[in-house]
C-alpha cells in the first residue's frame, strides 16, 4: 500500500497589535491538542508571534506578553507630561512619521535568532507592504536576504501612521495589514492543505478566505482591548480566552461566550435548564405578551449553543468572568452570585401572576434585565437541584 504523506497544516496568525496575546493562548491549546503545523504565516503581530512559535518559544512568548507594557513597545510621552510637553511630543511624532518602536525592536533582537528560525522544520511566511504604491509583499524566509529577518518582521508590524514606516535598503515598508491581515493565500501558496486561522479583528484589510481549504477559524466572542494598549492584565485575560476558544473550535468544550464542560453530566444539566427556562418563558409570555422583548433580546445575542444561550446571555449581562472553565452548574452558580438579586426579585410578580401593567411594561423596556430575571427564576425554582450561591466553582 502506498504511504500517504501527512496533511500539510498551516497556522495563520492575523495582525492586531496588543491583542496578539490572544494567539499565545491559542498556541497553548494547540500544543495540548497535539496539533502541530508544518507552515505558519502571519501579519504584523501575527508574524512576530509566529516567529516565536516556529522556534518553540512558548514560555518566552508567554512571559513576554505577561510583562510588557505600551512603554516597552514604543516611545510614549512621560505619564505626567504637561500640555506643552504633550503637544511637543505629538508634533515630533507627526514630523517623524509615527512613534519610535526601538523598544519593540530591542525585544525582537533579544528573542529571535535568525539562524535558528531558518533551520527550524516549520516553514514561515509574513506579509508587508511597500509604502510607495502600497505594493504588497508576501515573503517566505527563503525570500528574505540573510541578516534581514528581524527588519522584515518589524516592517510587517509597522502600523503606520501610528508607528513609523520601516526602511530596508532604501525602501519604506508598512504593516502587512494594509494588504492582507489574514494571510491564508500565502499559506496555500506555501503548500498548506488545512488551515487554522486566528483572527484578532484588528485594523486593516482582512480578505475573504478563497483558498477552498478546510479551515478552522478561531475568534474571540469578547473584546480583546485596544490594539496599541499593552497591559499584562489584559494579556493574561486574552491568553485564557484564546485557550478556551481553541478548545471550543476543536469540539473539546461547549458554550459560546463561556467555556463550559461538554461532558455527559454538564450536558444533561444544560438540557434540563433549557427545558425549564422555555417553560417559564412560555408561561410568562402567555400572561404578559409585552414581555416578548426578552425573547427578542435572546435571539439577538451572538450565541450558538441553544441550550446554554439564555444562561450565557444572562451571565454576560451580570458580568460573570469569561476566563474560567465552568460546568453548567458552576456557570449557573456564578450567575446567581453576580446578578443583582434585589432587581431580580422585583420581577417576581410576573412569575406569580400578580404583576401590574407597569411591571410588565418595565420588563418590556428592559429586555436584557428581564432575560436575567427569567434565568434567575428558572434556577431558583430548582431547574438544577442543589445549585446555590454557596456552591464552589
Where are the regions that the model predicts?
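Patatin-like phospholipase
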Residues: 1-43, 51-393
Amino acid at each position: 500500500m502506498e504511504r500517504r504523506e501527512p496533511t500539510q497544516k498551516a497556522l495563520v496568525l492575523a495582525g492586531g497589535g496588543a491583542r496578539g496575546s490572544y494567539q499565545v493562548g491559542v498556541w497553548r491549546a494547540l500544543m495540548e491538542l497535539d496539533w502541530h503545523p508544518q507552515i505558519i504565516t502571519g501579519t504584523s503581530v501575527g508574524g512576530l508571534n509566529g516567529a516565536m512559535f516556529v522556534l518553540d518559544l512558548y514560555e518566552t512568548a508567554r512571559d513576554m506578553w505577561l510583562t510588557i507594557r505600551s512603554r516597552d513597545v514604543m516611545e510614549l510621552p512621560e505619564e505626567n507630561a504637561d500640555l506643552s510637553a504633550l503637544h511637543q511630543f505629538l508634533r515630533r511624532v507627526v514630523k517623524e512619521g509615527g512613534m519610535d518602536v526601538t523598544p519593540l525592536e530591542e525585544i525582537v533582537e533579544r528573542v529571535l535568532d535568525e539562524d535558528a528560525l531558518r533551520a527550524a522544520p516549520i516553514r514561515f511566511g509574513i506579509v508587508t507592504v511597500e509604502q510607495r504604491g502600497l505594493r504588497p509583499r508576501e515573503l517566505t524566509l527563503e525570500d528574505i536576504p540573510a541578516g534581514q529577518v528581524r527588519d522584515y518582521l518589524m516592517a510587517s508590524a509597522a502600523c503606520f501612521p501610528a508607528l513609523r514606516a520601516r526602511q530596508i535598503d532604501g525602501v519604506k515598508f508598512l504593516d502587512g495589514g494594509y494588504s492582507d491581515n489574514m494571510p491564508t493565500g500565502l499559506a496555500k501558496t506555501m503548500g498548506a492543505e488545512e488551515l487554522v486561522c486566528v483572527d484578532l479583528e484588528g485594523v486593516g484589510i482582512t480578505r475573504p478566505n478563497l483558498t477552498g481549504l478546510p479551515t478552522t477559524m478561531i475568534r474571540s466572542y469578547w473584546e480583546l482591548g485596544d490594539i496599541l494598549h499593552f497591559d499584562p492584565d489584559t494579556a493574561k485575560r486574552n491568553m485564557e480566552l484564546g485557550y478556551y476558544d481553541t478548545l471550543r473550535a476543536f469540539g473539546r468544550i461547549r458554550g459560546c461566550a463561556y467555556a463550559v464542560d461538554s461532558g455527559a453530566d454538564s450536558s444533561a444539566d444544560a438540557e434540563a435548564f433549557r427545558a425549564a427556562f422555555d417553560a417559564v418563558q412560555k408561561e410568562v409570555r402567555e400572561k404578559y405578551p409585552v414581555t416578548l422583548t426578552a425573547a427578542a433580546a435572546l435571539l439577538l445575542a451572538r450565541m450558538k449553543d441553544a441550550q446554554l444561550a439564555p444562561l450565557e446571555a444572562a451571565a454576560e449581562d451580570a458580568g460573570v468572568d469569561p476566563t474560567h472553565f465552568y460546568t453548567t452548574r458552576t456557570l449557573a452558580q456564578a450567575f446567581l452570585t453576580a446578578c443583582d438579586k434585589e432587581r431580580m426579585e422585583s420581577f417576581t410578580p410576573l412569575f406569580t401572576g400578580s404583576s401590574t401593567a407597569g411591571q410588565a411594561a418595565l420588563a418590556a423596556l428592559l429586555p436584557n434585565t428581564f432575560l436575567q430575571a427569567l434565568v434567575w427564576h428558572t434556577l431558583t425554582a430548582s431547574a438544577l437541584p442543589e445549585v446555590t450561591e454557596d456552591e464552589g466553582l
